[in-house]
């Protein structure tokens, strides 16, 4: 009778909800791991591992290295990927003034300086390695030694030897 019919509909409903749930979870995971990194690569901190590797390989040639802070707080990623000794960092870093949200960030440690790097601000600084966002560096008249790209092929960083 009626109860048998309700049992079948209940089972059907549970199975249907399970299928919808599995579909949505798989769709979410696909969007998160396939599309999101291609659409918003900066949010995944892409490029920093390669950037730090390159900068570490040439840092002995420069007394100062200027790194853009356009993508998050790069000092954390530089410390992590370069395996910088914590005891050295703790004794020599400089914090910025607190912003309107009462946050500060690291502006300097060792030979590294982290700040925005529009070309008019850094172009006259010589004997320095400059890591900038691509839109901050002019297309001509600049000694771009390396470009680091996001996975989607767009430039993430331009590295200039000044």
Tell where the protein language model's regions lie, with residue ranges.
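Membrane-interface junctions at the ends of membrane-embedded or membrane-associated helices
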Residues: 1-16
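Short hydrophobic beta-strand segments
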Residues: 58-70, 113, 126-132
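Aromatic/acidic, Gly/Pro-rich catalytic loop(s) in extracytoplasmic/lumenal soluble domains
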Residues: 92-162
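Residue-level signal for alpha-helix termini/capping positions
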Residues: 4-7, 56-60
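Membrane-proximal, lumen/periplasm-facing interface regions of secretory-pathway glyco-
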Residues: 13-59, 70-82, 86, 90-116, ...
């Amino acid at each position: 009778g009626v109860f048998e019919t309700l049992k079948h509909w209940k089972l059907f409903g549970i199975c249907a909800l399970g299928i919808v749930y599995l579909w949505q979870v798989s769709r979410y995971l696909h969007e998160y791991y396939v599309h999101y990194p291609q659409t918003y690569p900066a949010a995944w901190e892409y490029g920093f591992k390669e950037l730090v590797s390159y900068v570490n390989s040439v840092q002995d040639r420069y007394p100062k290295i200027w790194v853009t802070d356009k993508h998050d707080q790069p000092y954390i990623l530089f410390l992590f990927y370069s395996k910088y000794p914590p005891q050295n960092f703790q004794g020599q870093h400089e914090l910025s003034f607190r912003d309107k949200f009462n946050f500060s960030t690291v502006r300097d440690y060792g030979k590294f300086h982290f700040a925005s790097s529009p070309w008019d601000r850094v172009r006259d600084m010589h004997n320095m390695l400059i890591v900038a966002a691509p839109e901050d560096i002019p297309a001509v008249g600049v000694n771009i030694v390396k470009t680091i790209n996001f996975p989607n092929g767009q430039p993430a960083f331009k590295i200039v030897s000044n």
